Amino acid sequence: MLLFLADLLAHFQSAFNVFNYLTLRVILGTLTALMLCLWLGPQVIRRLVERQIGQAVRDDGPQSHLSKAGTPTMGGAMILIAIAVSTLLWGDLTNHYVWLVLAVTLGFGAIGWVDDYRKVVEKNPRGLPARWKYFWQSAIGLGAAVTLYLTAASPVEVSLIVPLFKDVVVPLGLFYIVLTYFVIVGSSNAVNLTDGLDGLAIMPTVLVAMGLAIFAYASGNTVFAQYLHIPLVPGAGELAVFCGTIAGAGLGFLWFNTYPAQVFMGDVGALALGAALGVVAVIVRQEIVLFIMGGVFVMETVSVMLQVGSYKLTGRRIFRMAPLHHHFELKGWPEPRVIVRFWIITVVLVLLGLATLKIR
């Protein structure tokens, strides 16, 4: 929006051309989202408290979590508002990728909002029934996958790129739609599973978004893409602005979500942020890198799958409790220790993911 206005004003004052620089708009988008979240936070928390929209806590979980009962939830709404407003302000609204990632993010956010609303407002512990949750997730995920498949400008945009190898490009054909669906839906649910401790999910999300911003910037730049031997995806550079708004909004939310949390993001935030990371990774053709950088999300998801599978097959549990962060809590780790160590792991994994840009 502001880019369009700047282009008009540039006819009268050339200084406005500075807003055509992508790096500047990434920075401004990040700062705008950060400030919006910091401004919205107290107001959102106050309204959630007034309406008694508080987190319910399971009796069979770690005893330390009982004190969290009643903490305002659904705070992810402020993250989505900050992301949407900042992206619309600083992004190039003629770029179809911008509209696609916003649609996917807000669509998954709507699913999470309905789930949260039924749980905390209507006092229905099941929330949105699983079959309907996965139906709508699948509808949005497949819709995005088909759209990307039909609008691909070159074969490489629907191929699997293998990191560390310059020339390993695997044509996917229609399987691209299946892979894209699983990346978006899987990433969404993985972040949701990780969102169980104060600040545990949001900081890794911020870090991964920052990593993807670098990939998006490079993928949309002809010189960088050729030099780094990564796919050139025309228009993907604008996703760096979107990723910047995720990082900014996430840091703003962390101001209130850090231990001890004043607010939780709820499914409205977790499902949306996970889907956002997934769809960006798909567009810039870095699904495998997302798997690396989002290793904490992967560990949490795999721990649940192993726990459920082991219990059904043998009647025994592998972990004291799943997802994995609860296992460490029940081993006696204080909550802040679990959180910060998972953050440290994510920093290392994001750096490893970025290293694949050069090691080829």
UniProtKB/Swiss-Prot annotation:
Disulfide bonds: none annotated. Catalyzes the initial step of the lipid cycle reactions in the biosynthesis of the cell wall peptidoglycan: transfers peptidoglycan precursor phospho-MurNAc-pentapeptide from UDP-MurNAc-pentapeptide onto the lipid carrier undecaprenyl phosphate, yielding undecaprenyl-pyrophosphoryl-MurNAc-pentapeptide, known as lipid I. It is a multi-pass membrane protein. It is found in: Cell inner membrane. NCBIfam families: mraY (TIGR00445). InterPro entries: Glycosyl_transferase_4, PNAcMuramoyl-5peptid_Trfase, PNAcMuramoyl-5peptid_Trfase_CS. Pathway: Cell wall biogenesis; peptidoglycan biosynthesis. One of its GO terms (molecular function) is UDP-N-acetylmuramoyl-L-alanyl-D-glutamyl-meso-2,6-diaminopimelyl-D-alanyl-D-alanine:undecaprenyl-phosphate transferase activity. PANTHER family: PHOSPHO-N-ACETYLMURAMOYL-PENTAPEPTIDE-TRANSFERASE, PHOSPHO-N-ACETYLMURAMOYL-PENTAPEPTIDE-TRANSFERASE HOMOLOG. The chain crosses the membrane at residues 21-41, 73-93, 94-114, 145-165, 168-188, 199-219, 236-256, 263-283, 288-308, 339-359. GO terms for cellular component: plasma membrane. Keywords: Cell cycle, Cell division, Cell inner membrane, Cell membrane, Cell shape, Cell wall biogenesis/degradation, Magnesium, Membrane, Metal-binding, Peptidoglycan synthesis, Transferase, Transmembrane, Transmembrane helix. It catalyses: UDP-N-acetyl-alpha-D-muramoyl-L-alanyl-gamma-D-glutamyl-meso-2,6-diaminopimeloyl-D-alanyl-D-alanine + di-trans,octa-cis-undecaprenyl phosphate = di-trans,octa-cis-undecaprenyl diphospho-N-acetyl-alpha-D-muramoyl-L-alanyl-D-glutamyl-meso-2,6-diaminopimeloyl-D-alanyl-D-alanine + UMP. It is an enzyme of class 2 (transferase). The lineage of its organism: Bacteria, Pseudomonadati, Pseudomonadota, Gammaproteobacteria, Oceanospirillales. Belongs to the glycosyltransferase 4 family. MraY subfamily. Its EC number is 2.7.8.13. GO terms for biological process: cell division; cell wall organization; peptidoglycan biosynthetic process; regulation of cell shape. PROSITE patterns: MRAY_1, MRAY_2. Its cofactor is Mg(2+). This is Phospho-N-acetylmuramoyl-pentapeptide-transferase.
